[in-house]
Amino acid sequence: MRNFRRFTIALLVLFLGPIGAADTKETPGMDRQNTSNQFWWPERLDLAPLRQHGSESNPLGRQFHYAKEFKELDIQTLKEEIKTVMKTSQDWWPADYGHYGPFFIRMAWHSAGTYRISDGRGGAGGGQQRFEPLNSWPDNANLDKARRLLWPIKKKYGKKISWADLMVLTGNVALESMGFKTYGFAGGRTDDWEADLVYWGPEKKFLEDQRYKGNRELKNPLAAVQMGLIYVNPEGPNGNPDPLAAAKDIRETFGRMAMNDEETVALIAGGHTFGKAHGKSDPSKHVGKEPAAAGLEEQGFGWKNNYKKGNAEDTITSGLEGAWTANPTKWTTQYLNNLFGFEWVQTKSPAGAIQWVPKDGAGANMVPDAHDKSLRHAPIMFTTDLALKFDPSYKVIAKRFQENPKEFELAFAKAWFKLTHRDMGPLTRYIGKDLPKEPLIWQDPVPAVNHKLVGPKEIESLKGKILKSGLSVPQLVRTAWASAASFRSTDMRGGANGARIRLSPQKNWPVNDPDELSKVLKKLEQIQEEFNKSGNKISLADLIVLAGNAAIEEAAKKAGVKVTVPFTPGRTDATIEQTDEYSFSVLEPKADAFRNYYGPGNLMSPTEMLVDRANMLSLSIPEMTVLLGGMRSLDANAGKSKHGILTTKPGVLSNDFFVNLLDMSTKWQKSEQTEGLYEGLDRKTGSKRWTATSVDLIFGSHSELRAVAEVYASDDAKEKFVKDFVSAWNKVMMLDRFDVK
């Protein structure tokens, strides 16, 4: 019936005639558009993050293997073709100085620069710059043209290189074509096919900044200073031309994007060695709508400029105008020489933006015009550039770079590599022949496997020893979960490999029950040490996961279901020298609904944090549901809390959580003593049966989650529940095993 209805609608469209005429008027059907449930009930828990990026949206199909395609690519030939594009100016968007290199550097930088360490979101992976909102952010103005310039390359190579990889590679090639030696390039970034659901800030208009509280304290997880900017306002905080105030914004923003002071100075000084800013006239008078709001006839282009030619020397982008150096398409130290060699005074660009030029007209004929060889200009600086001169810490670094060009070159090369690869995860995800020879600490390296892996008989023997160790099922499950569930699919960090749960800072996180964790790890280390005395060896990272698996098999057995939890050895144990404590501190789960933990200082509600954590773990709605219910039955709450343990048989892998949650003989009410806690009362006697939190009750309250919970609460679901739990559990344990995927 549904297909027949679609066919009828299609026929009606055919007989009603061409739709072009209607498109020239007001958009038809606006009053008939569906209004989402979120509109009617804005407080309703939004499950959309768990439904994004499904395989159904990928036109390349479920079986497409990007890594295999990329490995067949002739990367050197591709790079030469990119260089040809770079030096072939197009009439529809002429190249500054006859070279698109600086333009492509900005494209690559802005593709990667959205990354933020707090939640790992943003970054170059997925090629999200192609989609809204990033495609239409003010800070990305005219980058639609940069990608369109690359379309002939993408068209030729098709599925062999993703847009995500192509944008970063093009940035590298741009640097190399202008005389700079890059630190390397890794492919492996797959393309997304829809816009990512990311919280970019509370603002409702571009360039607003309601993201601050108190004394300009930027709220987590945000990093940029204003809605629609990648980093900071180049004119200074909210347009205030104060270099020292700008330095504070720079340090905060770049720090939240994983860069220290030295990397920050290197990136700004290195990046502004190339190219120019564009602001030949007032954008409010001459620049049209961004791509998302432009007309169909623009075919994805935005920011149409009606000032004179509309491009070339009349281009309007940021509103700032000019170049920093006399050789904007060559790698030099001129940026630093100019920064410290001139005294800078405030002026305004032709568009009215605040910028800086040398005092008393110095350097007036230093910089060639980007399009008219008969014209010369003075160099310019942004307020944010002068921050490198006036901030004490930045100044020391910038002067050192000026005096030591080779050190500056290496620092920029490494910072650029970090910027463009920060969200790629471990080295096992890197593809290509141009990789750095030595691992970098921000890549969270782990040792290579240097021992023979355990086989089936040894695995069974180890499981027996674990179950006889005196450690309980909940203890083993909690420890394995704590080790693996630190993983973030957003930037592929964390996970069980490396056994960093035994190292600082992870061993001290409150959610991990440090006292209990220490005892469990000590016992497992004893088992490991004894086993490793002869024959094959096992890492602690592997043993932690195996211990959790053994506990689940035992718990399922007690429930009357025989099951074998998959186990793939090959993890190794990282050292403290391979672990950046500060870098790992951002992985700390401030809330973990699967362990019924909700720490202080969270900006989202417990149920929102449930969805966020499930999204980080790449879980579907059914996987999230069965995992939480199973963890409750296994008595795996943090701190041994009994909230949500809706079973009289804790430690048994049963579907009791769902059965008792949906039991109509229980009436739920808010606790009068504890905020956020609920009590389940016997409807007849009023006696208290259970206590639970919002992340427990949401599976009975939310209509879509209840529908899934009903499946697992059914009488015929006992075996399905166990098998689905095991499948989801194994998925979490294997999230960081890119070496076997």
Swiss-Prot record:
UniProt keyword terms in alphabetical order: Heme, Hydrogen peroxide, Iron, Metal-binding, Oxidoreductase, Peroxidase, Signal
Q: Quick one: which residues bind heme b?
A: 272
Which InterPro entries does the UniProt entry name for this protein? Catalase_peroxidase (IPR000763), Haem_peroxidase (IPR002016), Haem_peroxidase_sf (IPR010255), Peroxidases_AS (IPR019794), Peroxidases_heam-ligand_BS (IPR019793)
Residues annotated as catalytic: 110
A Pfam short name = peroxidase
Catalyzed reaction equations: H2O2 + AH2 = A + 2 H2O; 2 H2O2 = O2 + 2 H2O
Quick one: a GO biological-process term for this protein?
Answer: hydrogen peroxide catabolic process
Record site feature (Transition state stabilizer), residues: 106
The UniProt record lists the Tryptophyl-tyrosyl-methioninium (Trp-Tyr) (with M-257) crosslink at 109-231
Alphabetical list of Gene3D superfamilies matching this protein: 1.10.520.10, Peroxidase, domain 2
Kindly state one GO CC term assigned in the UniProt record.
cytosol
Q: What is its EC number?
A: 1.11.1.21
Q: Give the residue range of the signal peptide.
A: 1-21
- Cofactor(s) demanded: heme b
What remark does the entry make about the cofactor?
Answer: Binds 1 heme b (iron(II)-protoporphyrin IX) group per dimer.
Q: Which NCBIfam families match?
A: cat_per_HPI, PRK15061.1
Whom does it interact with, and what assembly results?
Homodimer or homotetramer.
Q: What does this protein do?
A: Bifunctional enzyme with both catalase and broad-spectrum peroxidase activity.
State what protein this is by name: Catalase-peroxidase
